Amino acid sequence: YDLQHYFRMMRDEGCDYVVMEASSQAFKLHRVDAITFDYGIFTNIEPDHIGPNEHADFEEYKYYKSCIFKQSRVGIINLDADYADELLAGAPCKMFTYAIDRAADFMADNIEHVNCPDFVGISFDVSGHTELEIQMDLPGKYNVYNAMAAISVLSLIGIPHRAIMSAFRRVHVDGRTQIVFKNDTMSVLVDYAHNEMAMENLLSTLRELQPKRLVVVFGCGGNRAKDRRYGMGKAAAEFADLSILTADNSRDEETTDIIADIKSTLVPAGGHYVEIPDRREAIEYAMTHAEKGDMIAVIGKGHEDYQEVKGVRTHFLDREVILETAAKYKL
């Protein structure tokens, strides 16, 4: 009952709302038992988190993802997501929907990218249950979906329209599509994308900004489902001009073995790559070999401030390394 303890502490401090992420593992391992959510949101699902330490197969994963509706007074679902109709039909609570490509209770359209010197974002209109004009410093269709999930809840609990629009103009998510360094040659950003879907969403969005080259620096976590490595290798081959393969949190595995798994799908798909296992050196290579007009995406860790190798965590923050590299080489 750790969660209940923390909820009580929050209430004692005057907190009225709690926004939390509940993973499929949380439902499987009973971490969120005895909790009724006022609003439960289902964003999307893909074949991930399947392995000895997570879920036995996709059906089990899907089942535990859907358990959120059993513990919610009101459910909200992305109607464009795979299996949305199936989950909507089986939901035991009152449901609302949001979408871009289908008719829903909350719909987004007129989506436009905004690319300014110090701002890479998106604007769109909301219609249906409410009408809003949204602009935010987070680009990509996938971020529109994330915003629509939040907008659905905010509208249903009665937050004024002006407050919602104002909040989105100021929204910032640490380590998500975060531009860290920019000069006349390159733009360098960090993002937490650490599986195939997230990587495809990010890189396809950055492609729409039409950089001369799209360079991605990434690895994969050790002791996690290997399918992530194969999926990210395919995504890199499809969307990146150059992949710099490096360490993430290798944990108990060898970084070179993880990179070999990534290469097993990246190379057959025609992807170009450089292999630099040391993450700092990989970032330095990307920035010191940049060509005019390059966009460099350092992904997989986002806001994380550590690297875990052989059970030891050491301080490592991608954005610090990017800024240190810029200063070191006077970029």
Where do the model's predicted regions map?
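Short gly/ser/thr-rich secondary-structure transition/capping motifs
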Residues: 1, 20-27, 56-60, 169-173, ...
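Conserved nucleotide-sensing/catalytic segment adjacent to the nucleotide-binding pocket
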Residues: 1-23, 30
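Short, high-confidence coil segments that cap the C-terminus of an alpha-helix
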Residues: 10-16, 72, 211, 293
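Acidic, Mg2+-coordinating active-site environments of NTP-dependent enzymes
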Residues: 11-13, 38-188, 263-270
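Switch II (G3) loop of P-loop NTPases
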Residues: 15-25, 187-194
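Short beta-strand segments
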Residues: 21, 44, 78, 217-219, ...
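Inter-motif core of Ras-like GTPase G domains
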Residues: 33-45, 211-217
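ATP-dependent carboxylate-amine ligase
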Residues: 92, 129, 149-331
